[in-house]
Amino acid sequence: MNKLKPVLYLLFSILILSCQPTVDNKKQPVAASAPEEIIVDCNYTFAEAIEGTKAPRSVTEQLELIDVEYYSMDGKIHRGQILTNKKLVADIKTAFEFILKEKFPVEQVIPVVKYNWNDELSMQANNTYSFCYRNVSYSRHAYGMAIDINPFLNPLRWKKEYSYRKDQPANATYNPEIPGTFSPNHPVVLKFKELGFRWGRNFKRNHDDHHFEK
C-alpha cells in the first residue's frame, strides 16, 4: 500500500492540473471601426454636367468635373461635384481637403445644370459651384475661374453708395455667427488667399463674401 501512495499522489496531481482553466495569452483582435458613410449629393458625367450650357466648345474644353468631400449642415460627410477650369483643379482640391479637415459646413456642391443654369436658384439653395456661363464680359464664373461657397449664408451686399441695387440672393441675411459663413480672418478665407484667390469681400462696389476667383 505504501508503494502505491506516490503513484496515487502523482495521478491526483495530474488530475488537479488538468482541471485548471487554461489562460490564452494571445491578444484578441480588435474589430476595426467601420468607415463613416459618405452621402452622395450628385454623380454627373461630364456630358451631363455641361448639358444645356450656352458656352462655346472653346470654353467647355477648358473645364473638368471633379469630386469633393465636405461636412454638410447635418454634420455628415457628403460627396459633391465641381465643374471648374482645369487651371483651378489642384487648388480646388487642396481647398476642399482643408475644408473637410476644418469641418467647415458646406450645404451642397452640385453643378448648376441642376438648376437649369439659373444662378439665382442655385444661390437660393445655398449651392456651392464654380462654372456658370453668364455675364461673360466680366464674370470669372463664365470660364470656371471662380467659386461661390454657401452663397445664401454669404450673400453679395452692395456698399452704401450702390444701395439702390439688390443684394443677392434675394432675402438672404449675413450673420457671421452662423456656421458656414465667412469673416475676414476665417481659416477657409485665409486658405483661399494663400492659394492665390481674390476674395469678393474686397470688391470695390460690393461685399461678395461667397466669391473667390483667379
Predicted regions and their residues:
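Bacterial N-terminal signal peptides that target proteins for export
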Residues: 1-8
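Active-site acidic/histidine clusters and adjacent loop/turn architecture
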Residues: 58-122
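Active-site-adjacent loop/helix surface patches within enzyme catalytic domains
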Residues: 105-145, 151-156
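Catalytic cores and adjacent binding grooves of peptidoglycan-active enzymes
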Residues: 135-138, 143-214
